Design a protein with these regions (language model features):
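Active/binding-pocket-proximal capping segment
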Residues: 348-349, 378-381, 400-406, 416-445
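An aromatic- and glycine-enriched ligand-binding surface/loop that stacks and positions planar moieties
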Residues: 1-2, 79-81, 85, 109, ...
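Conserved, well-structured interaction surfaces
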Residues: 2-78, 94-133, 138, 302-304, ...
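Extracytoplasmic/secreted proteins, especially bacterial periplasmic and envelope-associated proteins
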Residues: 28-38, 107, 111-118, 140, ...
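Short, well-structured active-site flanking segments
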Residues: 75-87, 157-159, 415-427
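Long, intrinsically disordered, low-complexity segments
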Residues: 29-32, 111-113, 150, 188, ...
Length: 543
């Protein structure tokens, strides 16, 4: 796939209405929707072949689910889309029949909402037969619905007057111009329904326990990405059963001298987002964060077996830059840093610039551009050199996200509700960081003001960033919060990839300057499509 290359002009602000994107939902999804419609019209029971009327009803509901899923993705990507959910183009069609305008965003979402609810009432909550894993379930319907309604309540599409002139061929506003607070309540109710139904069906956060029965936060967060549903990972609500293309993602996060393509990293901004071991952000003076200097001993912790099983015997090694020491467990599962342990070759990473035989940074695009490798979803036993990889399900929705979705929606529609902390704390407990409380007497907790909606919003957003990092959700979060222009524009930092020794390497250094234009909140309709259909209106600010 060349998707990684496609994104370069996008992040540099060079995207145009003639730019190509491999995903191309605009072309692909209508074809799939048409196939679903044809199937629904023609499927029938064949009892002698084991296709019972019940099975037929399941398959029809699965098609309804897929149609709603595709339409929700189209609306989230393009804003206004042509919408004819039940039409099948006849073979003797006139080209003019296909030229329809765009339907307002909220109308598409309302249709998807009804279809997902209807399908959820027909489909089972899960399948016990392994061969049926991956087929649509009621829980998948409710998961797609909950995230969709959360997005639909968010500032980008809920009364966004930036789009006052974004109208379809009938003169209707494509994005609503009036803020509707009830959308947050609808989203919260959808999230809670998902959680209630999922937990009743046996779904739960994935946990690995220590011998004393306590949660191992390192192993829990790591293995949640690798264990299959039938291995007890019932946190997975919706996944691609075929797994993933390991040779690409894993190779990009493996050094070139170890047979990888070593250019996939994370930003300094993400590194800074992880809290300290005590659960406080590094910006809090009470967090004990120390950025400069080096550790004088190996770091051990008694709440995990991860160090001995996966990381060569310690959390961090003596001589590690203090920036990376005493951080929360999720940090070590997600970020590979200089002097961090590389299990494939039983050594530590060397990110200093060099000729490539003794270093992981030879200065090419196959080297860390800012002193970091991505680590999340890279199994500690993966060996790119030998082509051996741990199975990794392609998780699209998981219960941990559902908890955070619910906390966010609840904070917007019912600030002060104690369930906001309940569900935030479920995530933090599994992550091994101190939980939040409205009391202020217990050092085992962090005091917060639950009634301060803005403070809680910041905490929820921060928790999403860390818990859901590298799962494909951050970009849509920044879009829907209308923060992308601020966050994705300007200098991006890391360590100094040109540094050949500690003194020159360990400096916050700009490795890239990015540009995010107001137009980029929506993907443009490709100019070829605009030229074909005079009824289409281009996404805002692209013309």
């Amino acid at each position: 796939s060349s998707n990684g290359w496609n994104v370069i002009p996008f992040i540099l602000g060079e995207w145009t209405t003639n730019s190509n994107w491999d995903g191309n939902f605009w072309a692909n999804f209508p074809q799939r929707i048409r196939e679903a419609n044809i199937f629904i019209q023609n499927v029938h029971a064949l009892n002698e072949q084991g296709i019972t009327p019940t099975e037929v009803e399941y398959m029809k509901a699965e098609c309804r689910f897929m149609k709603a899923y595709y339409y929700a993705l189209l609306a989230n990507t393009y804003g206004g889309i042509p919408f004819a959910p039940d039409e099948i183009t006849p073979s003797n069609f006139n080209l003019s029949d296909l030229m329809i305008g765009q339907t307002p965003y909220d109308q598409v979402i309302d249709w998807c909402d009804k279809e997902l609810q209807a399908a959820s009432k027909i489909l089972p909550a899960k399948y016990t037969e392994a061969r049926k894993y991956g087929r649509a379930t009621s829980i998948m319907c409710l998961a797609v619905r909950a995230r969709m309604l959360l997005y639909a309540a968010s500032p980008l599409v809920n009364g966004n007057t930036d789009y006052a002139n974004y109208k379809n061929d009938k003169g209707e506003n494509i994005i609503s111009q009036t803020y509707d607070a009830s959308k947050w309540r609808k989203a919260a109710d959808a999230c809670k329904e998902l959680i209630t139904e999922a937990e009743a069906a046996g779904y739960k956060l994935y946990e690995v326990k220590m011998s004393d029965g306590k949660i191992d936060p390192f192993m829990s967060y790591q293995d949640m990405m690798f264990k299959r549903f039938d291995e007890g990972n019932t946190e997975i609500l919706f996944a691609r059963p075929g797994g993933c293309n390991y040779s690409y993602y894993e190779a990009l996060a493996t050094p070139l001298r170890s047979s990888g393509n070593g250019g996939l990293g994370v930003t300094q901004s993400l590194v800074d987002a992880f809290s300290m071991e005590n659960g406080l952000p590094i910006t809090d003076p009470a967090s004990n964060y120390k950025e400069e200097g080096f550790s004088d001993a190996d770091e051990q912790r008694d709440n995990t077996d991860w160090a001995s099983i996966c990381n060569g015997g310690s959390i961090t090694r003596k001589g590690t830059y203090n920036m990376y020491c005493h951080r929360e467990p999720r940090f070590y599962i997600c970020v590979n840093f200089n002097n961090g342990y590389f299990n494939q070759e039983d050594r530590v990473y060397n990110m200093f610039r060099g000729d490539g035989t003794e270093t992981d940074n030879n200065g090419t695009h196959d080297a860390p551009q800012n002193g970091y490798f991505a680590k999340k979803k890279i199994y500690y036993k993966d060996n790119v050199k030998q082509g051996s990889y741990q199975y990794r399900p392609g998780i699209l929705y998981r219960l941990g996200e559902a908890y955070l979705n619910y906390a966010e929606a609840l904070n917007e529609c019912d600030p002060g509700n104690e369930e906001i902390l309940t569900y935030l704390n479920k995530i933090r407990e599994r992550a091994g960081v101190r939980q939040y409380t409205t009391g202020n007497t217990d050092d085992n907790y962090i005091h917060v003001n639950l009634n301060n909606q803005s403070e809680m919003r910041n905490l929820i957003h921060a928790e999403r960033r860390v818990e859901l990092n590298c799962e494909g959700l951050r970009y849509d979060d920044l879009r829907r919060w209308k923060e992308a222009e601020k966050v994705l524009t300007g200098p991006f930092y890391g360590m100094n990839a040109y540094g050949r020794d500690a003194a020159s390497f360990y400096k916050r250094t700009v490795y890239q300057t990015r540009v995010y234009k107001k137009a980029f909140y929506w993907f443009p309709i490709h100019q070829d499509e605009m030229d074909k259909n005079a009824k289409l209106k281009q996404a805002p600010y692209w013309n």
